[in-house]
Structure formats: C-alpha cells, structure tokens
C-alpha cells in the first residue's frame, strides 16, 4: 500500500540522516580531540575552553536542539540532521579526547625521541591506537541516534517519527502499528550490524 511505501522511504531517509549526522560529527571531532588532548596540544587554556564548549553542547538535550533548529530552519530532516550532529559533536568530542589522552605515551615519546615530526607522531604513533576506539564509539552513537529519530520527528525534525505522530493524530491505527513494527525492525537490524562491526574492530 502507499502508506507502506511512504513509511519505507521515510525510514530510509531517517537512516541516511542519522548516518550522515554521525559521520560529519566524527570528522569534526577527530581534529577537536587532538586539540583538546594533553598528549598533543600543550596550551592548557585552549584545551580548557574547548572542553567547556563541548560540555555546553553535550549538556543541552537533543530534543531542545531539535526545537531550536526547527525554529531556525523549518520543519524537515535538515533540522534533525543538525540536532544529531550537534549532540554527537559534544559527546564524541569528549570521548575522542579522553581516548587520545589515554593512549600509550611510551609509543609517542619513543617516536619523538627519534626526531619524528608532529604529523608523523600522530600518524604512526597515535592514530593506530585510537582509530578502533573512534570507529567503535561512532557506530554506537549511530545506533543510539536511530532510537532518537522517533523523538526528533515528533517535534517536526522529519523522519519516521513525524509520520508516526501524524497517523496517531488521525487515528489510523493500522498504519500506526505498521510504522511501529518498521521502527522495531530497523532498530534491530542496525543494532545487530553495529554490534558485529564493533566486535570485529575490537577483536582486531
């Protein structure tokens, strides 16, 4: 039926939005984590300001960000993407910087003692240690964002949550049930795939 096709398309849009938001946040957080880490960046004031900025972003709930972006850019998936991106930057930035801080300093110091450049130290001494952690955490947040997608849709940030809300208001209970089942299936598939990928990365 048309409603099934529409829900499927909206579900696909939700997956694309969530994955894009998480992917962009990951790209932004990698350089942020280096600047916020005492292993790489020695200017304490800059590190302090960046960490407080990340604390502020992380301290505002994703629902509040969604309302702000819906007001600024109107209804639709773009507001949802920005909400996911903003919250993920705050949280992943903190997690990435902590992972960088906890990297084995002996390997980094060993390369520095040989006169290696800062870029070489990061490329060969640091990234091999932290890259699996970054990927694992990013996948987990993509999985978590899929669950948040329904809430984002309720406030008008697009996605399958908006379709669910509209059908509940219209009392189309058969279509409501179909969308709920679709959400459960999508979450189960993404959870399973993410868990398998993260397990393989950690095992390696």
Task: Please report, for each region that a protein language model flagged, where it lies by residue.
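Single conserved hydrophobic/aromatic residue that forms the stacking wall/gate
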Residues: 1-10, 15-16
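Hydrophobic positions within alpha-helical transmembrane segments of bacterial inner-membrane proteins
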Residues: 22, 26-30, 34, 63, ...
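Cytoplasmic-entry segments and transmembrane alpha-helices of multi-pass inner-membrane transporters
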Residues: 32-66, 95-98
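Short amphipathic alpha-helical coupling elements at transmembrane boundaries
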Residues: 48-58, 98-113, 124, 166-170, ...
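Generic hydrophobic transmembrane alpha-helix motif, especially the helices
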Residues: 54-85
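Glycine-rich helix-loop "coupling/hinge" segments at transmembrane-helix boundaries
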Residues: 71, 148-183, 202-204
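Membrane-cytosol interface at the C-terminal ends of specific transmembrane alpha-helices
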Residues: 75-126, 132-141, 192
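C-terminal transmembrane helix and the adjacent membrane-cytosol boundary/short C-terminal tail
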Residues: 136, 177-204
């Amino acid at each position: 039926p048309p409603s099934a096709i529409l829900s499927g398309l909206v579900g696909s849009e939700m997956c694309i939005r969530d994955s894009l938001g998480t992917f962009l946040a990951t790209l932004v957080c990698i350089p942020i984590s280096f600047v916020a880490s005492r292993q790489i960046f020695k200017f304490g004031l800059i590190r302090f300001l960046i960490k407080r900025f990340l604390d502020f972003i992380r301290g505002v709930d994703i629902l509040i960000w969604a309302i702000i972006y819906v007001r600024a850019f109107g209804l639709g998936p773009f507001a949802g993407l920005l909400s996911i991106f903003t919250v993920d930057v705050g949280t992943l930035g903190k997690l990435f910087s902590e992972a960088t801080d906890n990297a084995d300093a002996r390997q980094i110091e060993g390369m520095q003692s040989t006169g290696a450049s800062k870029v070489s130290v990061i490329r060969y001494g640091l990234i091999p240690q932290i890259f699996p952690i970054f990927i694992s955490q990013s996948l987990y947040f993509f999985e978590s964002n899929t669950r948040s997608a329904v809430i984002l849709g309720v406030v008008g940030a697009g996605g399958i949550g908006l379709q669910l809300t509209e059908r509940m208001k219209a009392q189309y209970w058969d279509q409501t049930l179909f969308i709920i089942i679709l959400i459960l299936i999508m979450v189960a598939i993404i959870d399973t795939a993410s868990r398998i990928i993260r397990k393989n990365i950690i095992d390696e």
